[in-house]
Structures are given as C-alpha cells and as structure tokens.
C-alpha cells in the first residue's frame, strides 16, 4: 500500500506544478502572432532564427521586447529556460529598419483624418519619400496584409436569367438552379471568410497599439537610466558644494596653522603651497560655473526630451482613439450574417427539393407556375439580399484593411519619433559621461587639496606620535637585543661548564661510541646563526649601551615635542574629536613595550660579580629560595612528563594501531623546544646555587614556551574546527547544487525529447522537400533552354544598349566639355562686357551731367542772345545732344541683347514696372541669326531687330520719336521721359542682379550634368563587370559552366566517332541530367586521356557513376572548346555555376596526349580554371 500511495501521489504533484513554456510572439507592425514552445530553442540566436524565417526579417535587424519595455537579452532568455517559471509570455518583435524614418515628435503630426499623411513637419517631403521607399523595398509592404486575398463577390446568375413561364422546362430549371447553387456555395464561403477576417484584423490593430505602447515603455526605461545618471551628478555636485573647503581653507591656514609649530620650530604653514591653492580656488569657481551651465543645459534638454515622450504618448492615445474600430458597428454585420445563413439554408433547401423532382413532373403547368413564382421571388428578393450582405461585408473588410494600412504608416512615423527621442537622450548620456564626469572629477580633486589644509593639524600630530612610537620601538628593540646577547652568553657559559664536567666524569669511557660529544660544532653553528664569530667583548657592550642611551635621548626629545604640540593644539580652533584622537593615540603608544627576558638582572652574579648588590647576594644565598626553586623544578618535570605522554607522536611503536597521527608536525617542533634545557634538568642534586638559579631561569623560559605552544595548539584546533564547519557547509551546498543539476538534467532530457520529435518531423519534411526538388529540377531543365535563349537576346540587347550608352556618354561628355568651355567663355565675355558697360555708363552719366550743366549755362547765355545772332552755336548743341542720345541708346540696346543672349527677357509686370525674367528658347533666334559679329558674338550696331524685349521696343519708339521731333519744348519733354525710363533700369541694380543670378544657375546646371554623367558612367562599368561572356573568353571574364554530354552507341562500348565530348550546341549538352560528381581534371592532358580510357572500360552497370568533365557555355563558337580544370572539387554537388576565369591554357588536338576528350583532329581547345561566383545545387 505504501508503494501504491507513492505512485498515486506522483501525478498529483505534477499537476500541482505544471511546467508551461509556451510563448506568444507578436509582430508589432503587422499585428500577427504565433504561439510556440520555448523548449524548442536552446539559445536566443535559435529563437531569432525562427522569427527571421517566419517574417523574413534579418536576425541582425530584430528587436525583441517584453511586455513592460525590457529588451530580451541572451542571459534573460537563458534564465527563462532554466527556471521555467512562466506560463505564458508575450514577445514583441520589431524590425529595426522601420526605425529609420527619424523625425522630431510634434503634437500636430497626427491629423484628424485617418487617411491623411502621417508626416506633418518641415521635412515632410523627405520623410514621405523615405516612407514610400520603405514600402517599395518591402520593409513595410510585407507587414501590410499582402497575404490577405480579397475577392469581390459576384452577382447571381439568376439576375440575368429569363424566368418567364414560356421558357421554363426541365433542362432550363435544373441548369439554372444548379448554377445558382454553385454561386450560393461560393458566396457562402466568401461570407464566412469575410466574417472570420473581421475579428482577426481587429485583433491585429489592437496588437499594433500594444506594440507601440511597449516600445514607448522601452524608451521611458532607457530615458530613466539617463535621468538617474543626471540626478546622481547633480547630487554629487551639491555634496561637493555643501561639504567643500573652497571658502574655509584660508581661515584654517591663517588662524590654525600659523599657531602650530613643527619639530624644527617653524609653523605648519611651510608645508602648504599657498600660490597653488589660490590658483585652484579660482579654477574651482570657473569650474563650478561651467558645471552648473552644462547641467542646466542638460536639464533643459532632458525636459525637452520628456516633452517629446509625452507627445509620443499623446500621439499613441490619439491613434488609439482614431483607429480603434467600434465593436458596436459590427453588431449589424453579425445580424446580417445570421440572416444570411437562414436565407442560404432556405434557398438551398428549395433548390434541392426542385432538383430531386423527376422530369415528368415538369410537364405540369401548375408546377411550372410554382417554379416561376419561386424563381421570380428568389431573383427579386433572396438573391439581392444575399448579394447585398456579401457586398456589405466585403466593403467592411476593405475599410478595415485600409484602416490597418493607414495605422501602420502612422505607427512607422511614431517609431521614427521614438528613434529621434532615443538618439537625443543618447547624446545627453554621452555628454554626462564624457564632459560632466571629467569636470566633477577635477572639482573633487581640487576639494581634496583644500580639505588637506584642514586635515594637516591632525595628520602632523599623528606623524609626531608615529615618530615617537618608532623611536620607542627601536630603543626597546636595542635594549632587548643587548639583554638577549647577555642571556645567550650566560646560557653558553653554563652549557660549557656542564659539558666540561660531563666529559671530565664520563668522557674517557664514552669516547668509544660518542666522539661527537667531544666536539663544539654546535657552538659554531650557533655563532654563525647569531652572526657572532666570538662572544661580545666589553667594547661592543659599551657601544650597545651608548647607542641605547642615544636613542633614549632622542625618545625623550620627541616626547617633549609631542607634549608641547598637544599644549599648542588645545589652544587653537581645532575640533575636540581631533584632540581626543591624538590624546588616545599618544596614551596607547606610551603603553607599548617589548617583553623580554630578565636574565641579566637575575644572573649578573655569574657573569659580573662586581655589579651584584649586597641585598641580591643575600637573597641568592637564602635556603628558602633554593627550596622554592627545587619545588618549581619538580612541578616542571611533572608537567613535562604529562605533556610528553599526551603527545601521540612520542608513544612507542605499536601502542596506537593507526596511521593517523594528528598534529605530528607540531609535536615535533614542541619536543625540540621542550628538551632545549634537558642538560639543566639532569644536573646532580648538589649543584651550586648559581647553577640552580640559572636552571630556574631557563625553566621559566621553558614554561613560557610551553604555554605558548599549548596556545598555538589550541588555536590550530579552533582553526581546524572552523575548517571542518566550512567544509560541511560546502558539502551541503554541493548537495544542493547536485540536486539542482539533477533537475536541470531532467529538463534537458525533456528538451532533448522534444528536439528529437521536432527532428523527426523536419526529416520527414526534408524528404518531401527532396521529392519536390526532384520534380522542380525536371521542370528547371526545360526552363533553362528558354532562359538561355532569353538571356542571349537580353545580352545582345544589353550589348547594343551598352554601345549606344557608350556613344551617348561620349557625346554627352563632348557636349558637356563644349558647353563648359562656352559657358566659361560667355562668363568671361559677360564679365568683361559688364565692366566695360559699367565704365561706359559711368562715363555717360558724367558726360550727360556735364552736358546738362553746360547746356544750361549755354541756354542762359542763349536766352540773352537772340537766336538769329548765333545760329551756329545752336546747331552745334543740337548735334552734340543727338550724338549723346545715340550713344546711350546703343549702350541700352547692347545690354538688353546681352540679357536675351543668356535667356533673360526685359519686360513689364502687371503694375507696369520693369522686370527681368527667365524665358526658355529665347536664345535660339539669336543663335540662328547670321548678323552677329563672330569675333565678339555681339549685336550689330545698325540692326537691333533680334531684340524681343517690350521695354526695348518702348525705348526704341521714344528714341525714334525724339529723332523725329524738331527742336523745342516737346523734344525736351521726350528726352526727359527717355532718360527717366533708362534711369529706372539702372537705379535698383536690376541688370547686375539678374546677370549674376543667371550665371549661378548655369554653374548649378553644369554641376548637375557632371553628376548625372558620373552616375551613368558607374552604371555602365557595373554592366560591363557583371555581363556573362559567350565567346572568345579571356582571363577575368564571367562564364557559365555546365557538365558535358556523352553519346554512347552500345551498353558496353563507346564509339570513337560518336563518343566525343563535343556537343551540337556549343561545348555543353543541356539535356544531360546533372552528374553525381564532377570529374577532376588533372594537371596534364595525358592524365586526362588515361582517365577517359579507363572510364570507357567500365561495365554498363557503372555507367551512371562516371564523372563527366565540365565546360564553359559558348553560344556562337562551335569550333573551340573550353574545358574546366577542376582540381579543388568546385563542381561537386552543383548543377551549374557561374565562374570568373582565372587561367587559360591553349591546346591543339593533334596527338592522343593532347586530345583526352576525343575531339576532331586539329580542333583547338582550352583548359581553364575559375572561381565560383554563383551556382545552383543539385
């Protein structure tokens, strides 16, 4: 029963914790979605490849977002696969190319009309062109429901049928009803299709809105990181400003450092570089202003970016309001669909009933009348109602599809706004990371330098205390070394006395087996270890004492300096915590001492008897002291005995049957220290008091060592316990990891099972695909002949077009060069004419002014003189005035002719004001005229009939009128009008501005022509580079390579006349099936010949396994063959390939060694090598 319960609870537990790994992948632009199992994909790259194959999006252009705007990363996808903690996930897929329509978000870029242009900005034309380009290149068109096939419903055949009673019979009724039933079935299918499309398209539109919202959430998350970075910079700057020492360091420098003295007696101000700090203070002020300016600018940009995001959100909400279909609108369609079903059912039932009738029943007139009534009713009511419902549904679907397409265009515009906003915030992020961070680091560096001024009293005080501690330490170390040397010498003297006594008592007998006891090599090693060749003498001891005294004096001096410093610092403005810290540190330093042996004080009796006081001698001679030392010795011996037996390493061999001896190394080191004073413990009972005192001191030292060893052992035991606990924790953690790995292993096994199932399905699909490919290859062979013939025609056409384009290009280049030269000449001539005419105008104006003034003076004189008195002078003035008028008219004519010669016409506007405008074809009449001066291309002075300007015609009429009018007041009036019209032309610089503008237009046109010629030249070069050569191959040409055919007369033999590898159509037979493998042509024709002969001897059953050579396709050259030299297996697995020829080797088929392919004798053939450019696989 226990087993049964165990098995029964397993499925229940599995139901409690289901592992659902399905995911919904949503195309954010088309609104389509697919559901798949994430276990099918082992990595994010495989997941992207699946999406790329589904929606034809390149994997590097994929952007996948999660519902809250997080970007899907490989680590996140891997975590989803491992944890398997989700039941249903939505992945929103975007094509990065649709973000290329970058535009600034504006609140007016969405109009109230759904069909309006989504671009409403200063660059709307460019943005619209970019959108059209994206649609044209299928970046958007593939998302606009191009797969949705809409077939418009057709009217019923009953509408055009004649259902009069006289025309009704069995055959007409059955034919009409059968045809109508077919139409009814087709219409029903269409209506069901339309009805199913409505919720699908509405769901697509909602998903597009969801995709826009998720993308806006992604933008907000991205911008939030940048805003957090900005806030951290502002917070850091505020901390620097609030806690900075920019304005406080000078007070500390003057009030505090000036009152504190150093060891040398100077103030602490000498350690501060005041010039550098002042310069840094100025730099900090400038830097603070600069950082605040940058941060304020960044704040404005962030606020502007936030307004862009708000605009995007508002635009998305507007889109949602404008493009969300009203679901109540489709309630009528649902009712119509229900009535459609009822009508179709009734109409089909009536038709079936009639068709089930026998032919004899149609002879009854009553039955035919009932048929007439039924058909008339169906024709007028049922058919029209059904067709109206289908038309309504069709139009509704069309509106929804148009609505979705318009929404997609607006969505692409929104994506462009999001891309623009992200680029702006990215620039802000770079500014924060590059510039602001550097400025803040520099600001922080300056503040640290200022803070060091306030910290200098504390640091210098700590420096003095540290110096005192080091001197104290060194003085104590020297004292310890001096005392230790004396103790060591005492130990050595005692040991020498003990050894001499032992040798004296037992040496004569023990020399037989222990000669090493008679030597003193261990003392030599001890001296070498201690770096003393001999025991120290009195001079060295005096030097040590002097050095210790010197260090003690230095220590006292530093101590006095510290006391003085502490007194001074308490009188300054230094904070109490700093003073307390210095006092505490000084107190702890003075308590610092080195513990060392006091053997010198207790054993000077044996080394220097003169230095022992009488009280010490009395104490050493006391019996109580001797008894006390003997008691201590016994206690020490018992302790040593217990310690030795507690050490497992010193037990006899075999007592403890184990190979594990803990702390073996430590016990060895302890034993060595323990028996350091063994010779002292073995002294006889009647040892002298001095030796007893030495032994006591040695035992004290030994006890200290033993205690320290015990402490070390306890410490090691504690460390081992901690290590044991740590190992236990690691073992438990490893156990958890192993269980996790077991779970992961189970998950991977499930994944592998799913993958195996998917692999089996793919294998079946691959087999079906291979069958389909085989059938396609058969059709391809038929189509290849047609393609080749079409390609030949295209090649001929392209060759002719290329020649035409080359000629036209040369002609255009020559025309362009000639036009450039003519334009340059015209520009130079016009510039010279302008300068000359300007000078003439200035001279004419001066002469005209002088003439007027002189004429006025002469007129005054002539008023006093009667005309009869001086008629010659009057004639002279009239002749001079007439000459001046002629000269001015010639200048005006020449200027107007220059304008017309460059395509500009001087005319009047609607307000009768003079204007100069561009007129096409104006120069043709001038160019066709033969009255121009060929050297200057200027107008003949005696003929101005070519000038078409109405202004000139008016001036000409005025000029003729002046010439025809006799001298008098009327002539003066006409002259004033003539000069006024001329002045109107030159006063506003109308002539100069028009000429300069025209020459700028000519230069622009020349640049445009040059650019167009460059584009045409590039196009021609590309055509030349990509064309396939069909004859007269050269190195570098592109050629089509195909397997050759072989003509076999019988099953086992190959005729020499018909087995040639030549073809009736060039060197390739296109009807040959693709080879199983390509023949590898060796480096020499003789080897090829031997291979062909060997292949000819193969039995008929191996005929299909022969490897045929490949040759280049030649359409117009039947006498020359181009065989492929395939050394690298280029043809393996290929049906044909296009390659670029690398080498050509010429051969003549004049001998068997040079004719491996059995070509006609004397034939010319080439052996070529090529590199593959493109190919078709088998």
Curated annotation (Swiss-Prot):
Residue ranges of coiled coil: 538-572, 696-850
PTM field: Acetylated by the NuA4 histone acetyltransferase (HAT) complex.
Keyword annotations from UniProtKB, A to Z: Acetylation, Autophagy, Coiled coil, Membrane, Protein transport, Transport, Vacuole
Source organism, top-level taxon: Eukaryota
GO BP of this protein: autophagosome assembly; autophagy; autophagy of mitochondrion; cellular response to nitrogen starvation; cytoplasm to vacuole targeting by the Cvt pathway; pexophagy; piecemeal microautophagy of the nucleus; positive regulation of autophagosome assembly
Keyword Cell division attributed: no
GO cellular component terms given for this protein: Atg1/ULK1 kinase complex; phagophore assembly site; phagophore assembly site membrane; vacuolar membrane
Example GO molecular function: protein kinase binding
Mode of membrane association: Peripheral membrane protein
InterPro entries the UniProt entry points to: ATG11, Atg11_C, ATG17-like_dom
Major localization class: membrane
Entry keyword annotation includes Transcription: no
Cellular compartment(s): Preautophagosomal structure membrane; Vacuole membrane
Pfam families: ATG11 (PF10377), ATG17_like (PF04108)
Function: Involved in cytoplasm to vacuole transport (Cvt), pexophagy, mitophagy and nucleophagy. Recruits mitochondria for their selective degradation via autophagy (mitophagy) during starvation, through its interaction with ATG32. Works as scaffold proteins that recruit ATG proteins to the pre-autophagosome (PAS), the site of vesicle/autophagosome formation. Required for ATG9 anterograde transport from the mitochondria to the PAS. Also recruits the ATG19-prAPE1 complex to the PAS. Required for the Cvt vesicles completion. Plays a significant role in life span extension.
Subunit structure: Homodimer and potential homooligomers. Interacts with ATG1 kinase. Interacts with the ATG19 cargo protein transporter. Interacts with the ATG34 cargo protein transporter. Interacts with ATG9. Interacts with ATG17. Interacts with ATG20. Interacts with ATG30. Interacts with ATG32; to recruit ATG11 to mitochondria. Interacts with ATG36. Interacts with YPT1.
Family listed: Belongs to the ATG11 family.
Extra remark: Present with 86 molecules/cell in log phase SD medium.
Protein name per its UniProtKB record: Autophagy-related protein 11
Organism for this UniProt entry: Saccharomyces cerevisiae (strain ATCC 204508 / S288c)
Classification lineage: Eukaryota, Fungi, Dikarya, Ascomycota, Saccharomycotina
């Amino acid at each position: 029963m226990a087993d049964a319960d165990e098995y029964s609870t397993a499925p229940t537990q599995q139901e409690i914790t289901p592992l659902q790994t399905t995911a919904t992948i949503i195309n954010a632009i088309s609104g389509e979605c697919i559901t798949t199992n994430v276990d099918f994909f082992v990595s994010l790259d495989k997941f992207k490849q699946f999406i790329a194959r589904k929606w034809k999006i390149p994997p590097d252009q994929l952007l996948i977002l999660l519902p809250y705007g997080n970007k899907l990363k490989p680590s996140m996808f891997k975590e989803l696969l491992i944890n398997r903690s989700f039941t249903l996930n939505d992945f929103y897929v975007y094509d990065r190319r649709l973000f290329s329509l970058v535009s600034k978000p504006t609140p007016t870029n969405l109009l109230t009309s759904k069909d309006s242009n989504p671009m409403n900005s200063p660059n709307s034309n460019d943005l619209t062109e970019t959108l059209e380009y994206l649609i044209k290149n299928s970046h958007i068109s593939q998302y606009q429901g191009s797969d949705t096939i809409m077939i418009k419903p057709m009217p019923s055949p009953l509408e055009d049928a004649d259902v009069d009673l006289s025309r009704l019979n069995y055959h007409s009724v059955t034919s009409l009803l059968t045809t109508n039933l077919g139409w009814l079935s087709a219409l029903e299918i269409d209506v069901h299709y339309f009805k199913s499309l409505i919720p699908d398209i509405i769901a697509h539109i909602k998903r597009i809105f969801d995709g826009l919202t998720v993308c806006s959430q992604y933008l907000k998350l991205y911008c939030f990181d940048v805003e957090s970075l900005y806030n951290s910079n502002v917070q850091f700057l505020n901390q620097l400003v609030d806690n900075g020492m920019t304005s406080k360091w000078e007070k500390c420098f003057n009030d505090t450092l000036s009152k504190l003295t150093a060891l040398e007696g100077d103030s602490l101000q000498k350690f501060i570089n005041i010039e550098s700090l002042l310069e840094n203070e100025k730099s900090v002020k400038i830097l603070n202003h600069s950082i605040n300016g940058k941060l304020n600018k960044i704040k404005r940009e962030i606020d502007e970016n936030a307004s862009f995001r708000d605009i995007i959100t508002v635009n998305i909400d507007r889109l949602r309001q404008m493009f969300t279909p009203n679901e109540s609108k489709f309630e009528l369609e649902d009712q119509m669909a229900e009535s459609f079903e009822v009508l179709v059912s009734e109409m089909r039932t009536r038709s079936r009933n009639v068709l089930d009738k026998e032919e004899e029943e149609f002879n009854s007139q009553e039955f035919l009348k009932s048929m007439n009534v039924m058909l008339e009713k169906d024709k007028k009511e049922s058919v029209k109602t059904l067709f109206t419902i289908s038309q309504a549904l069709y139009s509704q679907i069309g509106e929804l599809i148009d609505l979705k397409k318009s929404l997609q265009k607006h969505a692409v515009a929104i994506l462009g706004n999001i891309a623009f906003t992200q680029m702006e915030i990215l620039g802000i992020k770079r500014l924060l990371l590059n510039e602001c961070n550097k400025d803040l680091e520099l600001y922080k560096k300056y503040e640290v330098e200022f803070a060091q001024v306030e910290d200098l009293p504390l640091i210098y005080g700590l420096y003095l205390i540290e110096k005192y501690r080091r001197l104290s330490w060194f003085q104590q170390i020297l004292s310890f070394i001096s005392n230790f040397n004396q103790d060591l010498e005492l130990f050595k003297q005692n040991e020498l006395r003990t050894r001499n006594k032992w040798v004296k008592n037992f040496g004569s007998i023990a020399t037989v087996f222990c000669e090493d006891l008679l030597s003193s090599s261990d003392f030599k090693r001890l001296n070498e270890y201690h770096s003393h060749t001999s025991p120290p003498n009195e001079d060295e001891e005096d030097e040590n004492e002097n050095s210790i005294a010197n260090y003690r004096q230095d220590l006292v001096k530093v101590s006095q300096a510290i006391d003085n410093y502490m007194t001074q610092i308490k009188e300054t403005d230094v904070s109490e915590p700093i003073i307390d810290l210095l006092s505490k540190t000084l107190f702890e330093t003075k308590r610092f001492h080195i513990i060392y042996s006091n053997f010198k004080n207790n054993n000077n009796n044996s080394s220097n008897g003169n230095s022992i006081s009488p009280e010490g001698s009395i104490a050493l001679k006391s019996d109580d002291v001797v008894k006390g030392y003997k008691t201590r010795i016994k206690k020490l011996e018992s302790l040593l005995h217990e310690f030795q037996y507690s050490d497992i390493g010193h037990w006899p061999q075999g007592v403890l049957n184990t190979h594990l001896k803990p702390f073996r190394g430590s016990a060895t080191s302890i034993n060595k220290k323990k028996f350091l004073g063994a010779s002292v413990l073995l002294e006889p009972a009647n040892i002298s008091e001095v030796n007893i005192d030495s032994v006591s001191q040695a035992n004290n030292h030994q006890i200290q060592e033993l205690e320290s060893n015990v402490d070390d052992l306890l410490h090691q035991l504690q460390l081992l316990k901690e290590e044991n606990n740590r190992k236990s924790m690691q073992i438990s953690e490893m156990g958890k990891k192993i269980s996790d790995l077991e779970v992961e292993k189970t998950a991977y096994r499930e994944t592998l099972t799913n993958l195996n199932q998917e692999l089996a399905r793919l294998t079946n699909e691959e087999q079906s695909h291979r069958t389909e490919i085989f059938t396609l290859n058969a059709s391809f062979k038929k189509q290849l002949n047609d393609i080749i013939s079409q390609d030949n025609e295209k090649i001929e056409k392209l060759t002719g077009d290329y020649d035409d384009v080359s000629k036209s290009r040369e002609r255009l280049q020559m025309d362009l060069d000639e036009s450039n030269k003519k334009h340059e000449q015209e520009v130079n001539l016009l510039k010279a004419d302008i300068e000359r005419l300007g000078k003439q105008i200035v001279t004419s104006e001066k002469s005209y002014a002088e003439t007027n003034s002189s004429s006025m003076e002469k007129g005054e004189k002539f008023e006093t003189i009667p005309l009869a008195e001086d008629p010659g002078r009057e004639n002279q003035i009239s002749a001079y005035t007439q000459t001046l008028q002629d000269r001015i008219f010639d200048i005006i004519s020449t200027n107007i002719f220059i304008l017309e010669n460059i395509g500009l016409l001087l005319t009047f506007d609607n307000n009768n004001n003079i204007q100069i405008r561009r007129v096409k074809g104006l120069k043709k009449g001038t160019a066709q005229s033969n009255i121009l001066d060929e050297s200057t291309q200027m107008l003949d002075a005696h003929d101005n009939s070519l000038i078409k300007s109405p202004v000139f015609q008016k001036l000409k009429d005025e000029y003729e009128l002046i010439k025809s009018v006799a001298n008098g007041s009327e002539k003066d009036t006409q002259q004033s009008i003539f000069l006024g019209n001329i002045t109107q032309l030159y006063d506003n610089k109308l002539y100069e501005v028009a000429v300069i503008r025209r020459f700028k237009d000519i230069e622009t046109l020349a640049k445009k022509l040059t650019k167009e010629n460059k584009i045409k030249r590039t196009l021609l070069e590309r055509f030349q580079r990509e064309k396939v050569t069909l004859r007269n191959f050269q190195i570098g040409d592109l050629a089509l390579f195909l397997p050759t055919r072989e003509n076999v007369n019988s099953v086992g033999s190959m005729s020499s006349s018909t087995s040639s590898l030549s073809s009736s159509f060039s060197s390739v037979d296109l009807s040959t099936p693709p080879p199983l493998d390509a023949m590898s042509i060796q480096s020499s024709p003789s080897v090829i010949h031997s291979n062909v002969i060997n292949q000819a001897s193969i039995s008929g059953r191996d005929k299909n396994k022969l490897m045929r050579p490949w040759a280049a396709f030649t359409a117009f050259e039947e006498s020359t063959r181009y065989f492929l030299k395939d050394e690298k297996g280029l043809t393996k697995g290929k049906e044909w390939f296009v390659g670029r020829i690398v080498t050509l080797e010429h051969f003549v088929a004049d001998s068997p060694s040079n004719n491996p392919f059995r070509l006609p004798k004397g034939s010319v053939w080439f052996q070529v090598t090529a590199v593959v450019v493109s190919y078709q696989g088998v």
